[in-house]
């Protein structure tokens, strides 16, 4: 009865927090709107920008039943679900789709046939970077027209599993968040032959880490291959890696604050509560883990890197280090940078891998902005006492883009940087 009462209390608290978050988001949006001076806005500036995407698919069979989708970074585009926005087939064989966003919003997307196994590719069948467009108001309120030609599609045959080693999957229900997700647990090669306890690395976007068959964009991080190789070479001590699958609420869950420009975000505290108070105790109970903070790290890429930085800021009693690949530092006017800027804000004895590719962004300006933000954060942390390649591993990765293939290349060096798991 006590267990049920506690579960009920947690459930009620979780629902109350979700309600509070919704009210807070509306309040923050209202406050932001009140701060806008109407005198500084034209009618065009204040109206949403309609974007018309026109897709031609010369490699798709001339079949009126074929379905083409946009998968992208907005709720209307499915928050990267592969079947986000269904396009309408026209008489000329092209596919059209429209959606609206606030002016100057940056939108990233790809074209799919409803599954990531059937995502668009270049003419040689290789993966392409996310398409990106900035919503610029058009004369007379006309739609911003984006024309796309799909060069080829990924192979439509069933993708074979690429898992190396002992990987298990579990459906995990969070009472705090009120949703479920897949948890991927990778165990080191000697786990079944030993009674040792192992350090644990928690990584976001778990479906993209181990297996091309589950990876959202057709590429995985090759975490299992990398960890196996480094362990066998005795370059790192064996560890457990937990991949936390994302959900349709990814944007909200991976951000601590509401971003008025994107009209999203702010459930990060709930997500961290799920991670530290629900998932970690379950992992510690089910597996032979070394439970202390010195043996517990957290990491991720993009928004996953952002929430991992916040995890170390908010719960340094749990995590002693962070892997932040291409973190979304621009979120909510660089709120994370402001948080770290407070005197001695970065926790003592908490280490950090921080990397950003030089080609992350759709324009030269956005690429420079991303690398500039990351370099400024690294300098700020060095000024607070973090020593290069001792406490802070900052890397500007030449020609790296914002995708799994780039993060896979960076992962070996990042894993070796973990002093908690090296010999």
Locate the predicted segments by residue.
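A domain-start/cap signature at the N-terminus of enzymes
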Residues: 128-199
């Amino acid at each position: 009865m006590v267990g049920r009462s506690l579960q009920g209390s947690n459930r009620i608290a979780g629902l109350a927090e979700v309600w509070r978050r919704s009210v807070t988001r509306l309040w923050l949006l209202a406050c932001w709107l009140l701060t806008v001076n109407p005198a500084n806005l034209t009618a065009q500036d204040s109206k949403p920008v309609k974007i018309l995407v026109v897709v031609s698919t010369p490699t798709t069979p001339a079949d009126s039943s074929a379905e083409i989708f946009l998968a992208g970074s907005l709720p209307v585009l499915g928050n990267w679900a592969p079947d986000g926005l269904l396009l309408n087939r026209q008489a000329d064989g092209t596919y059209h789709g429209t959606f609206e966003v606030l002016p100057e919003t940056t939108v990233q997307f790809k074209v799919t046939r409803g599954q990531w196994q059937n995502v668009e590719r270049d003419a040689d069948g290789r993966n392409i970077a996310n398409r990106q467009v900035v919503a610029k108001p058009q004369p007379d309120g006309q739609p911003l027209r984006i024309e796309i030609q799909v060069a080829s599609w990924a192979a439509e045959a069933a993708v074979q599993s690429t898992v190396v080693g002992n990987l298990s999957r579990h459906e995990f229900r969070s009472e705090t968040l009120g949703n479920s997700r897949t948890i991927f647990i990778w165990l080191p090669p000697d786990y079944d032959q030993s009674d040792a306890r192992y350090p644990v690395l928690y990584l976001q976007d778990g479906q993209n880490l181990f297996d091309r068959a589950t990876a959202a964009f057709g590429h995985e991080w090759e975490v299992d291959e990398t960890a196996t190789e480094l362990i066998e070479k005795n370059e790192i001590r064996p560890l457990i890696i937990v991949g936390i699958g994302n959900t349709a609420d990814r944007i909200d869950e991976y951000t601590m604050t509401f971003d008025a420009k994107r009209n999203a975000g702010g459930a990060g505290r709930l997500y961290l509560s799920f991670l530290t108070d629900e998932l970690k105790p379950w992992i510690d109970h089910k597996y032979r883990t070394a439970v202390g903070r010195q043996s517990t790290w957290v990491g991720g890429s993009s928004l996953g890197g952002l929430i991992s930085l916040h995890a170390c800021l908010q719960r340094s009693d749990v995590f002693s280090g962070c892997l932040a690949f291409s973190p979304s530092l621009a979120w909510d006017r660089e709120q994370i940078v402001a948080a770290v800027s407070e005197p001695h804000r970065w926790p003592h004895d908490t280490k950090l891998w921080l990397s950003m590719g030089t080609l992350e962004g759709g324009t030269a300006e956005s690429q420079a902005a991303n690398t500039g933000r990351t370099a400024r954060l690294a300098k700020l942390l060095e000024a607070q006492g973090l020593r290069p390649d001792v406490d802070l591993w900052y890397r500007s990765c030449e020609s790296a883009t914002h995708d799994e293939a780039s993060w896979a290349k960076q992962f070996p060096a990042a894993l070796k940087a973990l002093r908690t798991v090296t010999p």
